[in-house]
Amino acid sequence: MKYVHFDSLFRVINWLDTDQFDIALPDSVLPVTDAQWRYRDRECWVNPIAGKLVTTPPPGEFYRLSGDKWVYDASAFATALEQVKLQVVQSIKQYRDELTADYIVIDGNHFHSDANSRIQQMTLAKMGQAGAVPPGLMWQTKNNGLIELTNAIAAQFEVVTIEHDMRLFAVAQAHIAAVAALDDIAAVELYDWSQGWQP
């Protein structure tokens, strides 16, 4: 006897010939004729209720077999779309977090904005506002090397950091809203969320 072994989506995953081999048959099998056996090199599905082999492939990705007809599965599409959106949103949030800890810009200088730098900058902001930054204090930037840290620069740390965080949050939310509005998986995957982050 010849059989096809199929999965939960009724897709044939194995062709079994018990005449040639001593095989313990799995649960989900359907006997096939010699004529049907000719299709063993093609992708096939089964209609177990009618005992039929389906050789016509689905017309698209989100179709399921109902009897021996392919029907569009809107629920499967919606689930897949939601999963892709979640992945893109996660990437947007991760990028936002990386930029948050990257740098802030004051007078064209890029100052580190990781957690340790922010702690130092809070104190420096108070010193700058009070005019208490020592003259000649040199500070490392990400783009211009060592620069003299003046009271005018130091006084801006707090406000610029808050503006930086608020801007990145707003940009992330705008990208997340744009992704949420898309109703096509390819459009979600191709959406370019890399724009508009840093000044």
Task: Label each region the model flagged.
Residues M1-K2, D7-Y39, N47-P199:
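A preference for well-ordered globular domain cores
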